[in-house]
UniProtKB/Swiss-Prot annotation:
GO terms for molecular function: rRNA binding; structural constituent of ribosome; tRNA binding. It comes from the Bacteria. It comes from Deinococcus deserti (strain DSM 17065 / CIP 109153 / LMG 22923 / VCD115). Transmembrane segments: none annotated. NCBIfam families: rpsG_bact. The gene is rpsG. Part of the 30S ribosomal subunit. Contacts proteins S9 and S11. Pfam families: Ribosomal_S7. GO terms for biological process: translation. InterPro entries: Ribosomal_uS7, Ribosomal_uS7_bac/org-type, Ribosomal_uS7_CS, Ribosomal_uS7_dom, Ribosomal_uS7_dom_sf. Belongs to the universal ribosomal protein uS7 family. One of the primary rRNA binding proteins, it binds directly to 16S rRNA where it nucleates assembly of the head domain of the 30S subunit. Is located at the subunit interface close to the decoding center, probably blocks exit of the E-site tRNA. GO terms for cellular component: small ribosomal subunit. Keywords: Ribonucleoprotein, Ribosomal protein, RNA-binding, rRNA-binding, tRNA-binding. This is Small ribosomal subunit protein uS7.
């Protein structure tokens, strides 16, 4: 464990198109090797595709997908007297955001479509409708927490 003080969280600047901090966080999550311009093109291209296919406001569909993926509880390992228990704990807002975007991107990577724009758009639309890889991951995590509810009294 580091003994220095915890690094402060720098506030994220909203993106230029939607003026939304969550969109900025998603673009940063898409970005590889510092190529933010490419990441932005992928995200906004996916938004255009969502608009064409659903006829709805892409930011609204993205927020709906985000809310559907967001985990409420997760399990954390807690060692008590020689045995390790999977203890269900509530997820903080910051961790909810990072888990949601991480799960969304790993689900996007596993999709069969050819281009990154199509994969991202497909995952956003699927998640908004309650299906897709990221939703499955969230359900698995919450099911695990539900199965271990008996150990909730070990929460710290």
């Amino acid at each position: 464990m580091a003994r220095r003080r915890q690094a402060e969280v720098r506030p994220l600047q909203p993106d230029l198109v939607y003026q939304d901090v969550l969109v900025s966080a998603m673009i940063n999550r898409i970005m590889e090797d510092g190529k933010k311009n490419l990441a932005s093109r992928i995200f906004y291209g996916a938004c255009r595709l969502v608009q064409e296919r659903t006829g709805q406001e892409p930011l609204k569909v993205f927020k709906q997908a985000y809310d559907n993926i967001k985990p409420r509880v997760e399990v954390r390992s807690r060692r008590v007297g020689g045995s390790t228990y999977q203890v269900p704990v509530e997820v903080s807002a910051r961790r909810q955001q990072s888990l949601t975007l991480r799960w969304m991107m790993s689900a996007v990577d596993g999709r069969p479509e050819r281009t990154a724009i199509e994969r991202l758009a497909g995952e956003i639309m699927d998640a908004a409708q309650g299906r897709g890889g990221a939703i499955k991951k969230k359900d698995d995590v919450e099911r695990m927490a539900e199965a271990n509810r008996a150990y909730a009294h070990y929460r710290w």
